């Protein structure tokens, strides 16, 4: 006989605040953030990175969280220098992106220096900002000042330093 408590998923921890270091820690923060977004019903998510090559976007658990999160009225903004690594490494995410095109805005800035592009996940509730993407060192938190400053930086990139990119379908002749 199995105990019902043994079959229930682990409750999500509150998202942390403070410094983080290491690729595995970073990737787990991304997984936890998307799971929390689905659980808590975040209305908007913005992700930004030069290439997203080390983000766990193609993992089943991430796409399942995004699927649970996605619905009408939600907004997902994605900013990158190039989406080549996303297409090559994250097939599940690319399929999810095609399904939910109506709530997703993708922007690209191919001429930008990849080191200048913010590597971040922003929501109205919590943010994660990799200050050194190579070493996976960054900060997280829900403080209003941190959220506002990061959003202003991301808005500058979205509005003034990028163009539409990563279409959900490619039409051929």
Regions found by a protein language model. Give the residues of each.
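PLD/PLD-like phosphodiesterase catalytic module centered on the HKD motif
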Residues: 1-46, 50-173
């Amino acid at each position: 006989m199995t105990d019902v408590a043994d079959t229930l998923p682990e409750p999500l921890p509150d998202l942390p605040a403070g410094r983080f270091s290491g690729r595995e820690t970073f990737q787990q923060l991304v997984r936890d953030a998307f799971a929390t977004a689905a659980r808590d019903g975040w209305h908007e998510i913005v992700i930004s990175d030069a290439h997203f090559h080390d983000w766990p976007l193609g993992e089943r658990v991430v796409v399942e969280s995004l699927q649970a999160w996605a619905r009408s009225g939600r907004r997902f903004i994605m900013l990158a220098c190039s989406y080549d690594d996303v297409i090559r490494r994250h097939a599940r995410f690319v399929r999810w992106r095609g399904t939910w095109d109506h709530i997703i805005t993708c922007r690209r800035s191919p001429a930008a220096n990849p080191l200048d592009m913010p590597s971040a996940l922003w929501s109205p509730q919590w943010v994660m900002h990799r200050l050194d993407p190579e070493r996976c060192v960054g900060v997280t938190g829900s403080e209003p000042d941190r959220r506002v400053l990061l959003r202003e930086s991301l808005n500058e990139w979205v509005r003034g330093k990028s163009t539409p990119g990563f279409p959900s379908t490619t039409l051929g002749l």
